[in-house]
Curated annotation (Swiss-Prot):
SUPFAM superfamilies: Ribosomal protein L4 (SSF52166)
Protein's GO biological process: translation
Protein name (record): Large ribosomal subunit protein uL4
Function recorded in the entry: One of the primary rRNA binding proteins, this protein initially binds near the 5'-end of the 23S rRNA. It is important during the early stages of 50S assembly. It makes multiple contacts with different domains of the 23S rRNA in the assembled 50S subunit and ribosome.
Name of the gene encoding the protein in the UniProt record: rplD
GO terms assigned for molecular function: rRNA binding; structural constituent of ribosome
Length: 206
């Protein structure tokens, strides 16, 4: 599959062949869903916590005798039916991570790349380099490309000037090739790869 290569001035500077085994797979919504849920689960801090009956400060004395008062029997004022009492089966500090095999994770990344290519939302840039770190200059160039929500993936080594210019532009993310992931690809409308990124992704995912 061939696609055109453009520069930041929206000028066509060549063509590149995209490997079908990386950019030509059928869309698998089930695989993408599993991968996104796996990523979001790993991001959760899991610091949620409520106190059980053994953790609440207070007396352990029985509030009133068992029989003879006419009231319902109670054994502790720390029970959940009392104000300030415990919560039963409440959340505890834990990890939300779950397993997902490398084979599925690799397939999910290739599927995400293929989905963007099939939708016509995959652009290839000659290079992600900026002459100045000024955001205004880069924003104007991206406007000529029609990019309002995009993820730009470059090679292993990012251009520091480009990153500084791009980091204050809303709805724009810049990642190195090794940071490419399904969640960030899908959350932006357009995926922009540099020529270096294409070569390195194909070498890693073939």
């Amino acid at each position: 599959m061939k696609t055109t290569v453009k520069n930041l001035n929206n000028e066509t500077v060549g063509e590149i062949e995209l490997a079908d085994e990386v950019f030509g797979l059928p869309t698998r919504q089930d695989i993408l869903t599993r991968m996104v849920l796996w990523q979001l689960a790993k991001r959760r801090q899991g610091t949620h916590k409520t106190k059980g009956i053994s953790e609440i400060a207070g007396t352990t004395k029985k509030p009133w005798r068992q029989k003879g008062t006419g009231r319902a029997r109670q054994g502790s004022t720390r029970s959940p039916q009392f104000r300030g009492g415990a919560r039963i089966f409440g959340p505890v500090v834990r990890s939300h991570e779950h397993d997902l095999t490398k084979k599925v994770r690799k397939l999910a990344l290739k599927t995400a790349l293929s989905t963007k290519a099939a939708e016509g939302k995959l652009f290839v840039l000659e290079a992600a380099k900026a002459d100045t770190h000024k955001t205004k200059a880069l924003a104007a160039q991206l406007k000529t490309l029609g990019l309002t929500s995009a993820l730009i993936i470059d090679g292993a080594n990012l251009d520091e000037t480009f990153v500084r210019a791009a980091r204050n532009i809303p709805h724009l993310d810049v990642l190195p090739e090794q940071g490419a992931n399904v969640y960030d690809i899908l959350r932006r409308d357009v995926l922009v790869l540099t020529r270096n990124a294409v070569e390195q992704l194909e070498a890693r995912l073939k």
